[in-house]
Amino acid sequence: MSKFIDRVVLHVRAGKGGHGCASVHREKFKPLGGPDGGNGGNGGDVVLEVDPNVHTLLDFHFHPHAKAGNGKPGEGGNRDGKMGSDLLLKVPDGTVVLDRDGEVLVDLVGAGNRFVAARGGRGGLGNAALASKARKAPGFALLGEDGEERDLVLELKSVADVGLVGFPSAGKSSLVSVLSAAKPKIADYPFTTLVPNLGVVASGDTTFTIADVPGLIPGASQGRGLGLDFLRHLERCAVLAHVVDCATLEPGRDPISDVDALEAELAAYKPALAADAGLGDLADRPRVVILNKTDVPDAAELAEMVTPEFTARGWPVFQISAVSRAGLRPLTFALADLVREYREAHPKAAPKRPVIRPIAVDESGFTVHPDPDEPGGFIVRGARPERWVRQTQFDNDEAVGYLADRLARLGVEEELVRLGAEPGAPVTIGDVTFDWEPQISAGVDMVRTGRGTDVRLEQSDRVSAAERKHASRVRRGLVEDDEQR
């Protein structure tokens, strides 16, 4: 039997984007073929998908690192790099994804639901994509971006309609085994059940699931016993059923005190998904009291004594015996009625046809602030300038000049001048710090330098038709050579 794991920490890393290619087309009789470097492929995503055939997070317990494929670099001949392969991870129904700070990112309920845990990096553009009228043959390309990388916490919260709560050895597992076809481990010692057991119960035309949660003890909401680890499996339950051991001989225990102690723990526990599930706190869920083991001598008499107390609280009470199966039929009908009422009050939303709409993303904004750690320095923050820096190959002068042009067009340079930045001031963008040299005053010279232009366009050794005609006339003596005049 596989080990049940309901909480893991998963480190996900998406694939890196491939670098763009800086290449010039080479073909016979075409000395100026132009740039033909392809773009790099995007990195693969790490995706979580609900699979109804998966029931535990065991795979992630033994393999806590997940990495998607990297994108391939672009090649000459306008060949784009291959995209990195996505990594699809199967998770059980009811998996909750949280970040390291405990914030819920997504609640995966329903077969086929997906969540992109880490997005792959964008591939860099090749020099063919960077070519323009002013930059006919760029001698550089853009680098691919790194993919997202982060730690996620996966918690499994059972998807059941009815949750059985009670002290250890109250008979919860036995009840699940007789109400459904489930075969949980049953033994006569505390904490026999260490993992939640799910069973499917059919009553008339209603079918519902029932969950046997490991035994709770006072202090469970603070982590005593196994309660803190398994109370979360009750968060999705629409009905809570107290299973009370009427045959216990433990000193200081009786059905009323047992239920009161468990109610205190349920009231102290605050479900993280209460608002999302629409069920409210555990203390507000419908209750059913199941007085078990009434086939034991004196247990039936005790059950009769405590029944009025629970009835006065407005809770239905059922006296049963999981061993002899006495009283199970009315209990099953009552649970089915409560589940049916909940489903009628909370109908499932009809599946909507997915409509894909582009999301407008404004990356034009940026901020410039003085650097508190560097006198006279500045820090530039913004999605676009930081991405440009990550894509720049700083050992290529053309690439650095292209970055400077882009920052100037975005308005970063004007903002630095407005804030009083001096030439040579250290400016930090992302993880890169450089000495700033203003280019606004040299804007005309910047255009004349032909940055990113193939030098062969300016230095051509080809002889024109007029020059060939003049040379022929010189050889025949029809005209004098210009150099001999």
Swiss-Prot record:
UniProt region (Disordered), positions on chain: 64-84, 457-485
Basic and acidic residues composition bias: residue spans: 457-469
Named cofactor requirement(s): Mg(2+)
GO biological process: one example: ribosome biogenesis
PANTHER family assigned: DEVELOPMENTALLY REGULATED GTP-BINDING PROTEIN-RELATED, MITOCHONDRIAL RIBOSOME-ASSOCIATED GTPASE 2
Domain Obg: 2-159
Protein name in UniProt: GTPase Obg
Matching NCBIfam families: Obg_CgtA, Obg_CgtA_exten, PRK12296.1, PRK12297.1, PRK12299.1
Keyword rRNA processing: no
Family membership: Belongs to the TRAFAC class OBG-HflX-like GTPase superfamily. OBG GTPase family.
Enzyme Commission number, as recorded: 3.6.5.-
Location relative to the cell: Cytoplasm
Domain OBG-type G per the UniProt entry, residue ranges: 160-340
GO molecular function terms noted in the UniProt entry: GTP binding; GTPase activity; magnesium ion binding
